[in-house]
Amino acid sequence: MVQAWYMDDAPGDPRQPHRPDPDRPVGLEQLRRLGVLYWKLDADKYENDPELEKIRRERNYSWMDIITICKDKLPNYEEKIKMFYEEHLHLDDEIRYILDGSGYFDVRDKEDKWIRIFMEKGDMITLPAGIYHRFTVDEKNYAKAMRLFVGEPVWTAYNRPADHFEARGQYMKFLAQTA
């Protein structure tokens, strides 16, 4: 089951959990109200997983690739990690399936507070187009993820502020309806 919580405001290494004391957990229903979808799958059989194929078919996730985020495998690792951690949005959904390793997706709630979502092997998440978010590996500095797309991949990040995009406006309308 996914673990998520409101982040503390402490400065420091973004790869640390940043759990407040006392803890402020966030459940799947609260994530769903933000448009975030989550599945737990068997990452050991991702190449032939009927459950993954069903999700891909139902949601039209027709294109995929695999990215390994670690110093030895990802060119310009430090630069990429900083880029992933910049607060941004996309004009399309962001779909990630963790095949190995772990990391954190941070998303903004309706009050603009950060929610940290711990992702580990077998976790698959969809972040809706228009949601402000960021990603970092955890202290293990390693994550292998499947990136899925509807149609041809478009991976353009628009750093905040990016409220003028239609995807952001549509997302804000969605949030207003889930109030």
From Swiss-Prot:
Q: How is the cofactor bound?
A: Binds either 1 Fe or Ni cation per monomer. Iron-binding promotes an acireductone dioxygenase reaction producing 2-keto-4-methylthiobutyrate, while nickel-binding promotes an acireductone dioxygenase reaction producing 3-(methylsulfanyl)propanoate.
Sequence positions that bind Fe(2+): H88, H90, E94, H133
What InterPro entries does its record include?
ARD, ARD_euk, RmlC-like_jellyroll, RmlC_Cupin_sf
* Main subcellular location: cytoplasm
Name the Enzyme Commission number(s) assigned to this protein: 1.13.11.54, 1.13.11.53
The superkingdom of the source organism is: Eukaryota
Q: Which prosthetic group or cofactor does it need? A: Fe(2+); Ni(2+)
Q: Which GO terms describe its cellular component?
A: cytoplasm; nucleus; plasma membrane
List the coiled-coil residues: none
Gene3D superfamilies tied to this protein: Jelly Rolls
Classification via Pfam families: ARD
Instruction: Cite the annotated pathway.
Output: Amino-acid biosynthesis; L-methionine biosynthesis via salvage pathway; L-methionine from S-methyl-5-thio-alpha-D-ribose 1-phosphate: step 5/6
- What keywords sit in the KW lines? Amino-acid biosynthesis, Cell membrane, Cytoplasm, Dioxygenase, Iron, Membrane, Metal-binding, Methionine biosynthesis, Nickel, Nucleus, Oxidoreductase
Q: Which residues bind Ni(2+)?
A: H88, H90, E94, H133
Localization per Swiss-Prot or TrEMBL: Cytoplasm; Nucleus; Cell membrane
Which reaction is the catalytic activity of this chain?
1,2-dihydroxy-5-(methylsulfanyl)pent-1-en-3-one + O2 = 4-methylsulfanyl-2-oxobutanoate + formate + 2 H(+); 1,2-dihydroxy-5-(methylsulfanyl)pent-1-en-3-one + O2 = 3-(methylsulfanyl)propanoate + CO + formate + 2 H(+)
**Which molecular function terms from Gene Ontology are attached?**
acireductone dioxygenase (Ni2+-requiring) activity; acireductone dioxygenase [iron(II)-requiring] activity; iron ion binding; nickel cation binding
What biological-process GO terms show up in the record?
L-methionine salvage from methylthioadenosine; methionine metabolic process
Question: Transmembrane region positions?
Answer: none
Function as written in the Swiss-Prot or TrEMBL entry: Catalyzes 2 different reactions between oxygen and the acireductone 1,2-dihydroxy-3-keto-5-methylthiopentene (DHK-MTPene) depending upon the metal bound in the active site. Fe-containing acireductone dioxygenase (Fe-ARD) produces formate and 2-keto-4-methylthiobutyrate (KMTB), the alpha-ketoacid precursor of methionine in the methionine recycle pathway. Ni-containing acireductone dioxygenase (Ni-ARD) produces methylthiopropionate, carbon monoxide and formate, and does not lie on the methionine recycle pathway. Also down-regulates cell migration mediated by MMP14.
Protein's name in the database: Acireductone dioxygenase
Which species is this record about?
Macaca mulatta (Rhesus macaque)
This chain is encoded by the gene named: ADI1
